[in-house]
Amino acid sequence: MKNNNCINKKTNKIIKACMPMHTYGFPCRIDEIKKICDEYSIFLIEDAAESVGSLYKNKHTGTFGHIGAMSFNGNKIITSGGGGCIVTNDEYFAKKAKHLSTTSKIPHRWDYDHDTIGYNYRLPNLNAALLFAQLERLDDFIDNK
């Protein structure tokens, strides 16, 4: 530890982020991980790809850190044929994610001005409809798992 930073012993670099994974629907020891991350100002990104709908202490996995990442690939508990989402309570990250995932378009009279490299990470309507229908039945899918 140096200046209240957590240091990687092999690289001697400051650990800036941690990405714990909730595997097969089972929450990891997120309380312990979050406590360490909070103590050393480490950014916490949860990999909740395999735990959509899982709860830990009555709170959804993916909602303990700064950002939670979820997957809707074909092998997950609910699927849209692909895609995923992130969840956050941080307004800055929410706006940044939306901006980047919608081609980084900014309001402009030509309607095609971009302020940075953007991506088209939006689900097609058909895939989104499939996902929405499954989200409504998420509890049933979890009970049958």
Language-model-derived ranges and their functions:
Residues M1-S80, C85-V87, Y92:
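Active-site phosphate-binding strand-loop segment of PLP-dependent enzymes
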Residues S51-K57, F64-N144:
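Active-site region of PLP-dependent enzymes
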